[in-house]
Structure formats: structure tokens, C-alpha cells
Amino acid sequence: VCPSSESQHYLTTNHRPKAEVFRGPGQAITMIESSSPGFGATAIPMARFGAEYGYDLAELSNDIESVQRGGRWAVMIPFFGDPVFARFASWESAPRESTIGFWLGVDSSTWTTSMDRETYERAVETTRSAISKGDVYQVNICRIRSNGCAPDSDIMALDALLAEGNSAPYAGALRIPEIGIHIACASPELYLSREGSRLVSKPIKGTAPRAVDLLEKDRAENIMIVDLVRNDLSRCCDVGSVKAVDLLEVQQHPGLVHLVSTVQGEISQHVGWSNIIEATFPPGSIAGAPKIAALDIIDSLEPENRGPYCGAFGWIDVDNHTAQLAVAIRTFWVDGGLLKFGTGAGITWGSDPGAEWEETQLKARHLSSIAERSWNHS
């Protein structure tokens, strides 16, 4: 199976080559440089996906081939940066005592953004100009919001806050202090799931406060990305098996609605996870179409790299032929002592710059307010 040339180009240019990081019994770990020194440094490694909590970190790698060794792995493949694959030996139905700390809410008045309204609207116009020239059909343009956070706050406590205030179907969290990984995800979007040989993706395109506010532009945008996802899955699935089984489903989420479509296929024989990721990453809904042209525009317009935001986040269990990877949207992470959160919008020729800015505000408003609250397990 040949990976998509677009995905291969992206993985080569945005994921820096590095020797495998491996941690196993009796072996030292080669550290990935921590971007958040001191943050949560006394906490033990831990993961949560759904109602299961991962403990007892057994292996740590940045090579996707590691998951073929078996076990259940937490997976973080950032939009920009080094991937992390972490195998936890124990998965339990409740958090262990004293393994979740506290979250001291961030100051609501000190959020900063990588693009203010004027800059963002100018980026929308630049993208529309590229569309008018036929260079691209759709591009997802994002900005990163940042805020200072207490160095002894625990991302798992923020995850608990998100679970209470923003229940999401593909939520999860990962804390590995020794390599600076602190991520809490409340994603409504499925990048990939696997059950046996079946591979499923559920791209989101189209966002509004209410269903009646959805526009024809939202529907057109969704259909464009469905075609892109069908093409991606066809690179790792049996010929003729890839199909859209649900189109333009309206889903209600806290504070907004989304248009969601479902695409599925049957994985070809001898195709492993490295082939699947190479064929489909990054997710089409947060890149654009055609993907390589959209990624070039993103690189030229976004002043801050996305890091984990818009990447893949979830788990893979090769032994049971199952997996669930979210598109890492509605996701908080810690970088250099700052809490970060990305928000964006899909730009088409029919986009209004002011309305696209407001969409980024809508997506950020509810979750930002949750991060401004405090939480303590006791």
C-alpha cells in the first residue's frame, strides 16, 4: 500500500527525525525535551479515555511501529512535533486514590491569541484569494489562545472539569511529566476508529449556535471534506469498500451544533498502523482540500504552530484490533508554563471574514470558561 504523497510530505517536513524513545523493564529512557519544566513534575504518568484510567507506564516511544508489540497504547500524534506512544500496563475503571491533583482556574482577563480579529480576518481574505485562483477549495485557519497557569496545577484535574462541564464522545487526557506531556481533550470529532478490519472516520464540518443557523456553505464544506476522507481511506482500505454511510447529520454539543458525516472502509490485508496514519494524517477536516495545498497555506498564514492541536489523540490496542483516535480539537495542553487552546474555522469562497472570526469565538467560549474554574478532588 502506497501512502498518500500529501501525507508523506507532511510527515517528513513537520515531524523531526529522532531515534526511538524506548522505556521498558531494566532500560533507561531517552528523554524527549520537556516543553513544560516543572509543571506537574511530581505526578505519576496517567491516561484517561472514556471511563478507563491507564496506570503503570511500561513503554514510551515516538515510533508508531512500537504499537505492534502489543498492549494498549495511549497515542498523541501532534499536528506539529514529535508523536508519543505510551503503553500503560494497567487499565482500571476508576482513578486511583491521590493520583489526580487540583486545578487552579486561569485568569479570564489574561487570555492572549496568536491572531487578533484583524489578523484573522486578513488571513480569511488571503485564503479566499487563493481559492479564487483555483489553488485550493477549502482551508482550516486556526489561532492559538494562551494563558498562564499555576505550575502545580494538574491537567488531569482540568480533564475532570471538562468531563463535568463539556461531556464529549472522544474525550481523554494524558499526563507524562518526564517528557512534558500534559493534554486534556474534549473532542467531539472522530479521526479514526477500528473494530476488526473496519476503519471509520466521522469528519465535522459546519458549526453554528443552532441547527437553523447552519448555512449552505456549511453543507458544501462538509461534502468537500467527505470526498477528501474517502480518498484518504481508499489508500489503506480494500477497493470498493470505502463509502459514506451517513451524510450531514446534525449533532448537538454544549453551546453549538455540528454537521457530521461518517465514512468507513475495510482495511486491506497486511496494512499496519504506520500505513494507515501515513495515508490519512493529518485529518482532512482540520487541513483542507486539496490537502497539500491547504497545508502550505496554513504554514504561511498561522504565526504559531499548532502543536498537539488538530493532531490525533486516543488509543490503539493491536491485540484486540481496536482503536479510537480523536481529532485533537477542543483540546488544552501545557507548553512552557502556558495553558494553550486552539480554535479555528473552515474557509471557503463563501466565507465571511467576520463570521469566521465569530465561529472561532463560539468554539472557544464555553471551554475557556471551564478552564477558568477551579477543581479539587477532595
Predicted regions and their residues:
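Extended alpha-helical targeting/anchoring segments
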Residues: 11, 16-378
